[in-house]
Amino acid sequence: MIRACLLAAAIVLPAAAEPGGLDVVVGNVRSAKGNVRVAVCDKATFLQETCAYRGHAPARPGEVIVHIAGVPPGAYAAQAFHDENGNGKIDRTFFGIPREGIGFSNDAQMRFGPPSFADAMFSVGAGGGRIAFALRYFQ
């Protein structure tokens, strides 16, 4: 009986005690093509390929929720894009304008380039959290 209880606790507790889970609600997704990809970055890795926390979910019109596991407490900025063609990168025009929907936490605006970390920054507490922002399509 004790062995069964210990086994059950070993299975249930890790799932229930996931520290720092972050739900990212990405709005204004225009179609069900491809995936919505999210990166949650600290200041040193913002806008870099080296963001430690990433996730994706199948696209659907409206809102898509992407769960990012294991984000420790701290200051972060999130970026998301609608990878409509499934190539894993943001496609751009000759002038560098994104061809696919793109967005940043706090709905930070892109003005002749990406926003600053300070404009997109949010905090994650010990219990994780939930943030929401919308994609913008330039084409």
Protein language model features and the residues they cover:
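Surface-exposed loops/turns
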Residues: R60, P72-P73
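Exposed aromatic-hydrophobic patches
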Residues: V64-G70, F133
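Hydrophobic h-region of N-terminal signal peptides that target proteins for export
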Residues: A8-A17
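A short tyrosine-centered beta-strand micro-motif
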Residues: G74-A80
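A short, amphipathic beta-strand motif
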Residues: L22-V29, V38, F133
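Acidic, glycine-anchored loop motifs typical of Ca2+
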Residues: E84-R92
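Extracellular beta-sheet/turn segments enriched in Thr/Pro/Gly and aliphatic residues
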Residues: E100-F138
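Short, acidic Ser/Thr/Gly-rich low-complexity loop/linker segments typical of extracellular
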Residues: Q48-P61
